[in-house]
Amino acid sequence: MIQMQSILEVADNSGAKKVMCIKVLGGSHHMMAKLGDVIVVSIKEAIPGGKVKKGDVYKGVIVRTKTGVVRSDGSTIKFDKNALVLLNKQDEPIGTRVFGPVTRELRAKKYVRIMSLAEEVL
């Protein structure tokens, strides 16, 4: 579960390395974000020459969480780190590649583009 002030890694090649959650989108009482949710983030660490710079504010969709997700067959998928993919104003990925695995649950949230850019889909 991701809440405000949580630090996440960026799983794409947009140039950002670490981001901090500043708002969880989706209703007035939506306090925690889970896999596939959209959050507003601030860039905390970025590489020089990237598409984004430190201090910028973007939206991002969560692709990996430590909490994991329970599927309908009872299996659970958990990851070592929390990660997200940065989105632009039109809710399209900023980067052209997605590093690491993503889950099939993103398809139900209408993020098929992220799944096609990912190295592996679990």
Curated annotation (Swiss-Prot):
Record function comment: Binds to 23S rRNA. Forms part of two intersubunit bridges in the 70S ribosome.
InterPro entries found in the cross-reference section: Ribosomal_uL14, Ribosomal_uL14_bac-type, Ribosomal_uL14_CS, Ribosomal_uL14_sf
A Gene Ontology term for the protein's cellular component: cytosolic large ribosomal subunit
GO term, biological process aspect, one: translation
Alphabetical UniProt keywords: Ribonucleoprotein, Ribosomal protein, RNA-binding, rRNA-binding
Gene3D superfamilies: Ribosomal protein L14 (2.40.150.20)
UniProt keyword Zinc-finger, yes or no: no
Stated family: Belongs to the universal ribosomal protein uL14 family.
Stated name of the protein: Large ribosomal subunit protein uL14
Source taxon at top rank: Bacteria
PROSITE patterns: RIBOSOMAL_L14
CDD domains, alphabetized: Ribosomal_uL14
Xref: PANTHER family: 50S/60S RIBOSOMAL PROTEIN L14/L23, LARGE RIBOSOMAL SUBUNIT PROTEIN UL14M
Subunit structure: Part of the 50S ribosomal subunit. Forms a cluster with proteins L3 and L19. In the 70S ribosome, L14 and L19 interact and together make contacts with the 16S rRNA in bridges B5 and B8.
Keyword rRNA-binding: yes
Gene: rplN
GO molecular function, one term: large ribosomal subunit rRNA binding
Coiled coil: none
